[in-house]
Each structure stands twice: as structure tokens, then as C-alpha cells.
């Protein structure tokens, strides 16, 4: 998804109440980070295909476990390093029981303890996702895996928390295998149906 600050909002900070009011009335997903509101706009065909493939693979692998997979409509809440609340919409979220779901606005439950999140990158969102959102995701105590999937080439950057430290690994090529929450997924299955 594209991370765009609307030109009218670039230099304006919003209160959490302002954000929640706008979110309640919005027909698109809005993220709230450090007082700024980001509109999450339409996705490319490749983005949609990759996200669908990820959802299908993890649904199959997690079926019958205490973990679940949610699409990009699952909002994740986190307190940033300054103690401010932030609310984002990962492209894919994996959560294990017990889920910490809280009603933050009138229409949605917000997940505060995801185990893993995935972001499908595009030229318009990769800086925002790999810098701003990565730093937020790394603050979530329950988070073990943060995955960035390129849609313009076969490449995945996988951040894993091991003994309190975050380590990254890059996977490239259709034969590579990535493991998240004990689910081994071959990149060929993630990129199935995507042409470059």
C-alpha cells in the first residue's frame, strides 16, 4: 500500500481523538504515527497476489494451532519510544493466543500483541515501512518476526528477534525458504502468479 500524507496534512499534527474521528468516517485505512495521519491507498496487482499467497500459505500452516492469520484490515496498536500511541495496518498479521484485542474506536478491534507482521513493499512505501514501521514493530514485546517482501523482484528481508536482539536476513531466489512461527515457506509459493 502507498503511504501518503495528504498535502493538506503534511505539516499538521493530529491528536489521537482527531485520528479516531477521521478513521471512523473514512472509507480507506488510515495509519497514525507520531501525530501524523497516513492514508493507505490502493495496491498493485503484484501486491495483492503476494499478499493473497502469504495469507493462503500461513492459513494452511497455522490451521489447528493457537495462531491465526489476518489480512490488511487488522489494525495493530503500539506505544512508540515516546509513549505515544501509534496505529498501523500491516499487510498481513500473525497472532497467537491469547490475543490482546482492544476496542479503540467504534468500528474496529485493535491487536496489541502480534507475533509476526508482513509488509509488501513498493517504491512509494518502502522507506516508510522499513524505517518508521520497522522501528514501531520492534517495540512490541510479543513480536518475533517482521518481514518485508519486495514486489518488483524476488527478495525478502526477514527480521527475527533472538534473545532480545533483532537480526535481519535477506532471502532471494525462488528456491529459498523462510521460516516464521515454525512455518517453512518457499519463496516460489510467495511469488506464485507474479510476473516481473
Question: Where would I find each of the regions flagged by the language model?
Answer:
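Gly/Pro/Ser/Thr-rich low-complexity, intrinsically disordered segments predominantly at protein N-termini
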Residues: 1-196
Amino acid at each position: 500500500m502507498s503511504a501518503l500524507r495528504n498535502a493538506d496534512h503534511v505539516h499538521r499534527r493530529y491528536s489521537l481523538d482527531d485520528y479516531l474521528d477521521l478513521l471512523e468516517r473514512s472509507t480507506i485505512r488510515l495509519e497514525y504515527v507520531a501525530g501524523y495521519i497516513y492514508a493507505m491507498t490502493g495496491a498493485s496487482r503484484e501486491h495483492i497476489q503476494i499478499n493473497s499467497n502469504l495469507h493462503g500459505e500461513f492459513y494452511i500452516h497455522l490451521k489447528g494451532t493457537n495462531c491465526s492469520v489476518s489480512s490488511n484490515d487488522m489494525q495493530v496498536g503500539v506505544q512508540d519510544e515516546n509513549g505515544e500511541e501509534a496505529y498501523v495496518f500491516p499487510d498481513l498479521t500473525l497472532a497467537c493466543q491469547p490475543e490482546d484485542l482492544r476496542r479503540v474506536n467504534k468500528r474496529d478491534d485493535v491487536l496489541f500483541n502480534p507475533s509476526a507482521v508482513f509488509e509488501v513493499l513498493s517504491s512509494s512505501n518502502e522507506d516508510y515501512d522499513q524505517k518508521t514501521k520497522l522501528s514501531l514493530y520492534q517495540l512490541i514485546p510479543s513480536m518475533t518476526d517482521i518481514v518485508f517482501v519486495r514486489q518488483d523482484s524476488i527478495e525478502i528481508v526477514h527480521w527475527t528477534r533472538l534473545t532480545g536482539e533483532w537480526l535481519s536476513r535477506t532471502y532471494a531466489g525462488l528456491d529459498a525458504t523462510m521460516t516464521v512461527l515454525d512455518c517453512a515457506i518457499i519463496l516460489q509459493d510467495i511469488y506464485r502468479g507474479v510476473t516481473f
